[in-house]
Each structure stands twice: as C-alpha cells, then as structure tokens.
Amino acid sequence: MRVLLVGGGGREHAIGEALVRGGAELYVVSKHKNPGLARLARGYGLAKETDIKKVLEYAEKFGVELAFIGPEAPLEKGIVDALEENGIPAVGPSREAAKLETDKAFARTFMERNEIPGRKVFRVFTDVSKMRSWVDDFGRPVVVKPIGLTGGKGVKVVGYQLRDNEEAKSYAEELIRRDGRVLIEERTNGVEFTFQVFTDGKRVLPMPLAQDYPHAYENDEGPITGGMGSYSCSNGLLPFVTREDYEKALETLKATVEAMRKEGTPYKGILYGQFMLSKGGPVLIEYNARFGDPEAINVLPLLETSLLEVAEGIVDGNLQGAEFEKKATVVKYLAPKGYPTNPVRGVKVEVNEKAVEEVGARLYYASIDENFTLLGSRAIAVVGIADSLEEAERIAKSVIPHVKGELFYRRDVGTRKSVEKRIELMKEFGKEFEPNPC
C-alpha cells in the first residue's frame, strides 16, 4: 500500500521506518529532506507541512492510498479534513478533534464538561483585572499557559520559570495583551510521564509508558526544549508508576475518546497524554494529538504488529491489536551547540553508520538535511534497546563517539541515577509505593 508520511523530524523517521517494516510503500512530504527518510521513501516532496495545497498535490502525484500525519502544526490547519475530502484516509484527528492539543482552553473545558478523570482547577481569562484578582484569591502556586501551540515552550510554572504568583500575573497579562486570552491552572506537584495510545475513535490500544527529559542541560537545568531524550522500561510501566496509576491514566484517555465520540467529534490517530503523577494519582497536564518526539522513538522500534495494519485499523474504525517487544529503551538526542536559544546552523556533521550498527544501536535523523548539515534544532536521536535500562543506556551512549560535529547531548538521560532521582522525588511528594523494576 502506498502511504504518504507528512513530516521530516526524528519522530517521522521512526514512523517511516515502522511503516516500511510493516509492508508500506513510503512517500514523504516535509520541509527539508531527512536523510533517513530519503532512503526509505519511493518518492519525496519538499514543502512546508502546513501547506495543505502542496501536500495534496504530492499525494495525488504519488497516488497514495493512506496518509500518516507526524507533527501537530498541519493537524491544526485541517490537513486530515483536506486529505479525506480528496478521498485519502489519514491517521490523525480532524481539525476539530485536534483542538484537544491546539486549543488548551478547549481541552480543559471539554474535560470539565465530561467529568474526565485527572482534571485540574483552571480558568481562562480575557480580562487582566479579573485574572489578577482570581490569582490573588486562589492563593496557591499557578501555571500560566498560552492557549495555542507553543512547541512545548510557552508554559511557565511558579517555582520554576516564574518566581511567584506576582510574576505569574505579569506573564499572564503579557499573554492576554498578545493573544487575547490566557489559561491559568493550579500547579500540581509530582513527576511527569508520557502515555501514548492508538485509537480508531472507539477502541484504545496503549503503548509502553515513557519519560522524557525536557531541560537542555544535565540535572534538569537550563531552558525547556522539545525533549533531549527519554526512556521506557521492559514491563511497559515506569519505576514510579504503579499498576493502579497506569490504569487510572489509561481511563483518562479512554474516557476522552469516548466523550469525543459522544460529542460528535470522533478522535482517531495517536492520542498522547502528558501526565503529572501526584500524590493522589495521575493528573493530565496536556493532551497531544500525535506521537511525542522523542517518545515515538522509544516505542515504535518495539512495535511487533505491522504499523501499516494498525494505521489501516485506525482509519477503518477496526483497530485490532498492537503488540510491543518487552525491552527497555533509551533515546538520547544530539542537538547543535547553543540549542535551543542560539543554535549552530549550517555546519556539517559526520556519522559513522557502520560503527553505530556494530554497537547494536539505532539512529534517527531529525533537523539535519540530506548533506548532513545542521538546520538548528535537535539533529540526531540515538537509541539503545536491551533487556535492562542499564544496557539500553550503555548502547545509546556508545554511539556518541561515532557522530562528529558541533553537537551536545545530556549524558544523564536514562541513567539509573537520574531514574532513582525521580523515584526519590515522588517519595518526597508523599507517594507511598514499591518501585517497579526497569
């Protein structure tokens, strides 16, 4: 089957590889030519992923029968609706359903209206004085969020990016003046984790949990990035997530899909819940309407079921099953020096792919072009897969000497020490549990 993949990052390289492994004939449209995808694809179109007209032209030219949407920006523009109107079924939510990610105020009011478990106290404001008096009355630390897509970089939390609620009010005022409205939520203390599922609008199939490292530098310091790496465990859980917590988080995602269906906006594709595990259980921080990047790179190499079959099940409303190999994974992203604030661009990197293969690791290309020139964002994801976390981390780390260029990475991603730190943090927040093996 001819499948069009929209997007050209590390996440999309992992999707493309899984589609080809599952029997698809792959065609790609993205704004730059990803060297990994270029080898897998029968045809490659260069266009902005949000240029719906151009994407449709390529879809027609390649004669594709199915599309798979990688990033969130084209979903917001209604790419799935446009493809389906032109007779091409697509893996991804409609523009309206994608509002779970693209409109944070929509997502929170939807959860409230449908009594979805894992809700937070929130308010949406358009008026500066009302916002200021509510924050004063609330009296507890808050989180300030822009309403739309921010690439994970516009959210600010009191005690982290914001000193106190006074600073939160100033930032919220800035957003109201810029965007016309702002979302303010209670701050939840805990440890974050990623829960991704496949859904056809009715059935929900879970993937292994993952945890990412959003800060640029070691020990969770520095600016927030798209994610400097992530890990997953062989049992599909995480050391600090109990089976009960897992079931509660899954119930949040199932209830979401069911409520979307009942409201007449069926959600199909990948739904990704970013959860905060608090003392009282999992709380939904935000929805994402697509795979995580890097978290897609943890789970897709483990998928034993054909991704093409899963994709067909999603668009046909007949999702059957998704089996994953029981292995631990560690993904480390190599990013240009200076990322994310002032990244090096236009410089070439050298990759010894043969040596990478010999150490048993995998590589996924991201913000790098066909000439191996850095484009300014996270460039290459290296992945270790093994029975234990330690071995997976060792494999991922052993790739680093075989990639030469003006790059940096977080050495602590997926290390036992960093995972133990998260377990300790959870205990400090008053959660009583016996850590799962990883």
UniProtKB/Swiss-Prot annotation:
Name the enzyme's class. Answer: ligase
Any note on cofactor binding?
A: Binds 2 magnesium or manganese ions per subunit.
By its UniProt entry, which InterPro entries does this protein fall under? ATP-grasp (IPR011761), ATP_grasp_subdomain_1 (IPR013815), PreATP-grasp_dom_sf (IPR016185), PRibGlycinamid_synth_ATP-grasp (IPR020561), PRibGlycinamide_synth (IPR000115), PRibGlycinamide_synth_C-dom (IPR020560), PRibGlycinamide_synth_C_sf (IPR037123), PRibGlycinamide_synth_CS (IPR020559)
Q: Which residues bind Mg(2+) 2?
A: 286, 288
- The residues forming a coiled coil are none
Q: Does the keyword rRNA-binding apply?
A: no
Domain (ATP-grasp) spans 108-316
Gene Ontology biological process: 'de novo' IMP biosynthetic process; purine nucleobase biosynthetic process
Pathway(s) of this molecule: Purine metabolism; IMP biosynthesis via de novo pathway; N(1)-(5-phospho-D-ribosyl)glycinamide from 5-phospho-alpha-D-ribose 1-diphosphate: step 2/2
Identify this protein by name: Phosphoribosylamine--glycine ligase
Supply the source organism for this entry: Thermococcus gammatolerans (strain DSM 15229 / JCM 11827 / EJ3)
